[in-house]
Amino acid sequence: MPLGVVVRPGRGRADYPPAVEHLIRVADEVRAALSEERPVVALETTLVAHGFPAPTGVEVGLASEAAVRSAGAVPATIGVLDGKLVIGLTESELGRFGPDARKLGPRDLAACAVQGAVGATTVGGTLAAAQTVGIRFMGTGGLGGVHRGFPTPPDVSADLGACARIPALIVSSGVKSLLDVGATVELLETLGIPVVGYRVDTLPLFYAAEGGPPVSARVDSADEAARVADAHWRLGGNAVLVGRPPDESLDVADLIEAIVAEAHDRGIVGQAVTPFVLAALHERSNGETRRVNRDLIVANAGLAAEVAVAYAAL
């Protein structure tokens, strides 16, 4: 296959232009899968570094990879290490992603690589990295979006910008629980990003299986999701968000609202908000939110793999 050529929309490629070769390292397993046009699913490292305390973060990352493999796809966990964007981290490399790792959106990848720092990719950062080799499927917990209180401050996740630019399918349990869900869905519509419910008619509210805004379409199988994504991309579309509800619902909406208000009162802003909210939720729910969070992340990775496998068979 010629260098840098995508054989059909979303199939992926085994190589990348020589100009970026010194910045990217692709694991042999991932490279082989892309070369053979087998399904590959991207996984982020922010969940490993900042979503859970050590060693739970690594355990969740490995469980997500196992779920991808069980569904018949190849996992590609992404992060920045030793001056390179690594697509397909090893287990020992995952162990280097702790709370001191930089949190990388699309804008941060280059500086982190050049400066030789350890960088954990967000959804947006993972999508940007995955795009360099043509990976179009990703599983995660929740998408970033519009923070509560917008426009004071005007805080909107770079995940949405990446979704607006990059043709990819992301499986999540809706958007992050601390966000303004309604405003985020409105912005997704403005950006032309389909919000697809997996066997549900409303967007999951991360910890809760239902109760969010209506989705733009519903699918009832991985094959149907793959066909919707294929048609969307053939028509020139960008990302597709597939909302998979958690298997177990928690009613923590009031608790989240109180913790978000506390973060605001304490002057916690930007990338520091999510870790603060997650830690407080864990403490005040007696560990229930962290358990549900772990389970939905792994399940979403598995569904992303099922959709990737179905897409490869189209």
Per-range role (PLM):
Residues 90-167:
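Divalent-metal (Mg2+/Mn2+/Ca2+)-assisted nucleotide/phosphate chemistry catalytic cores
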Residues 207-233:
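Anionic-ligand binding region
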Residues 31-36, 40-41, 70, 129-132, ...:
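Solvent-exposed alpha-helices and their adjacent loops that cap or buttress functional pockets
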Residues 122, 151-164, 168-189, 220-227:
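Active-site glycine-rich loop that binds ribose-phosphate moieties when present
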Residues 232, 236-299:
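A C-terminal functional module that forms or caps the active site or interfaces directly
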Residues 41-43, 76-80, 119, 137-142, ...:
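General beta-strand structural signal in soluble alpha/beta enzymes
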